């Protein structure tokens, strides 16, 4: 069934004359909007009242940071030296090549800059952002599936998908959809449940759960996902670059949770609140 679905899909969502809009680009836009909506609704449920202008500024700043960070991390960690001899192609984001790990770092830095400008508490803003972020991750992974990229290893399971092209004619794990479900839907549900606990979890706790949860899921899914062709397996063939970058996330997430509990600072939106 998944195989039939894949072959019915087109990476191009809308094509009208010279205008072409891809599902991958739509995933970024809709993902950012959904994250903003979840942030707004969650902070209202917590009893806060961030202005729409401030929220919009934070989301825009974080998205810009995310795109820059995602691209730079891919160039540095996955490019295998290619971009040092083809520097202009660093800007060719339409050809793919984005790293979640870099997007996370860039998004955080972009968000922090805007928070300082508007005197927002970056810890609470980050917590609010990660409660909605799994929805964006889910859409992004679904777009990867539509594009026929980041596919998994060969499988004889009934939901295997023949991606064709460089993936060959053998059924493969739809690893993109595994991630869409686990780091998207499952992680979103976990964070939603935690966001409704009374009393509220302290600042940094949600960020810790998100980072650790993503790291665990990504590390495990990498076992059935084909590594980037230009890198293959690292450290003697035992680990992928994705796993190598995800292990620090698991550790950082755990440290954040412990730090949040020890610090035990209540959530607040504005620094002068």
Where are the predicted features?
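A feature for loop-to-transmembrane-helix boundaries and adjacent hydrophobic helices
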Residues: 1-273
């Amino acid at each position: 069934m998944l195989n039939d679905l894949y072959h019915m899909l087109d990476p191009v969502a809308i094509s009208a004359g010279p205008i072409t809009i891809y599902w991958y680009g739509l995933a970024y836009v809709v993902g950012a909007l959904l994250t903003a909506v979840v942030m707004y609704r969650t902070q209202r449920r917590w009893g806060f009242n961030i202005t729409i202008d401030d929220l919009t500024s934070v989301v825009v700043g974080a998205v810009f940071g995310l795109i820059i960070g995602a691209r730079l991390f891919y160039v540095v960690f996955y490019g295998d030296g290619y971009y040092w001899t083809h520097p202009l192609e660093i800007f060719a984001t339409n050809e793919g090549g984005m790293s979640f790990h870099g997007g996370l770092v860039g998004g955080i830095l972009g968000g922090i800059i805007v928070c300082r400008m508007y005197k927002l508490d970056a810890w609470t803003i980050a917590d609010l952002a990660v409660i909605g972020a799994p929805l964006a991750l889910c859409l992004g992974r679904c777009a990867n599936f539509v594009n026929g990229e980041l596919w998994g290893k060969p499988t004889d399971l009934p939901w295997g998908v023949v991606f064709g092209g460089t993936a060959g004619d053998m059924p493969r794990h739809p690893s993109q959809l595994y991630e869409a479900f686990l780091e998207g839907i499952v992680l979103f549900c976990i964070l939603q449940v935690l966001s409704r606990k009374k009393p509220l979890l302290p600042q940094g706790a949600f960020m810790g759960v998100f980072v650790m949860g993503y790291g665990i899921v990504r590390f495990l899914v990498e076992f059935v996902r084909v590594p980037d062709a230009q890198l293959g397996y690292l450290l003697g063939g035992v680990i992928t670059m994705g796993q190598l970058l995800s292990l620090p996330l698991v550790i950082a997430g755990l440290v954040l949770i412990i730090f949040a509990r020890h610090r035990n600072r209540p959530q607040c939106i504005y620094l002068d609140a």
